[in-house]
A protein has these predicted regions:
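N-terminal export/targeting and maturation segments
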Residues: 1-75
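A generic structural signal for solvent-exposed, polar alpha-helical segments
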Residues: 25, 30, 47, 101, ...
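Intrinsically disordered, low-complexity regions enriched in small/polar residues
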Residues: 26-29, 43, 88, 97, ...
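Aromatic-enriched hydrophobic runs in primary sequence
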Residues: 53, 73, 93-95, 135-145
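Exposed beta-strand-loop-beta-strand "reactive/processing" segments of non-cytosolic proteins
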Residues: 60-101
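A short, surface-exposed beta-strand/turn
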Residues: 93-119
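C-terminal partner/receptor-binding element of secreted or periplasmic proteins
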Residues: 112-147
Length: 147
């Protein structure tokens, strides 16, 4: 991998980390409280309504801002896309497929599978995004190149 390719991968990692940092967060639920609420709801046959069940389940979410991203690999996908694997906050491994470049910015468009539970955490889009830069020390770059 030459210096130009290294610089391009570094820029992709920085942009992707900042995008996640500004637009997403993760949450987990207290397992005991979740089980207690499920018992009370009992698939619609319990002592609380569906609306109450949904409200209670949402209220026990424990949110965490994204404060660390570790990039683990880059590979070329079956459709010549760039597949990027990373770990958020040391607990949420995920990946994205970069295959579309924005006509406006000339950079990759990012998309993520929100709502998936991985290691008891869920990635969720923030209600209000920001434009801050993630501290460089919190981005763990991979320099292995594209596999």
């Amino acid at each position: 991998m030459n210096e130009k390719e290294k610089a391009e991968l570094h820029e992709i990692q920085t942009d992707l980390a900042n995008y996640l940092y500004n637009n997403y967060r993760i949450y987990t639920k207290n397992k005991e409280k979740s089980e207690e609420i499920k018992k009370k709801y009992n698939r619609g046959n319990g002592s609380i309504t569906e609306k109450e069940y949904l409200q209670k389940m949402k209220s026990i979410r424990e949110y965490s801002d994204i404060n660390k991203i570790e990039f683990t690999s880059f590979s070329v996908g079956p459709m010549n896309s760039l597949d990027v694997e990373f770990i958020i906050n040391d607990v949420y491994p995920d990946y994205t497929i970069l295959g579309t470049i924005s006509a406006e910015t000339g950079k990759f468009r990012y998309s993520f599978n929100t709502g998936n539970t991985i290691n008891n955490y869920v990635l969720e889009r923030k209600e209000n995004s920001s434009t801050e830069k993630m501290p460089e020390k919190n981005i763990i770059y991979t320099n292995k190149g594209v596999e």
